Amino acid sequence: MSKQYYVYILASRRNGTLYIGVTNNLVRRVWQHREGLIDGFTKRYDVEKLVHFECFDDVRQAIHREKRLKKWKREWKINLIQQSNVAWDDLYDQLDII
């Protein structure tokens, strides 16, 4: 079984502050953000709602995608989220299926 890597987007609320990250354990990483265990941007701006994620088999591809998304215009990021999550639902509770 190959290792999985995830690029994820957290939001403070619908159309709110966005944070993009990469991890090899999405459940643990989002939980850390939600519990305030990671000092910095997400804790400071209360960004803890998982609104989008993508899965990769190759860590280099995941990191490349994260860097590309971080350079995107805000409008493009919002459109990406809304393509798969129109209501901006928190996807964290659905993570037990991955």
Report each predicted region and the residues it spans:
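An amphipathic, aromatic/His-enriched active-site/gating alpha helix that lines ligand/cofactor pockets
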Residues: 64-82
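GIY-YIG nuclease catalytic motif and its immediate N-terminal context
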Residues: 1-38, 43-53, 60-67, 84-86, ...
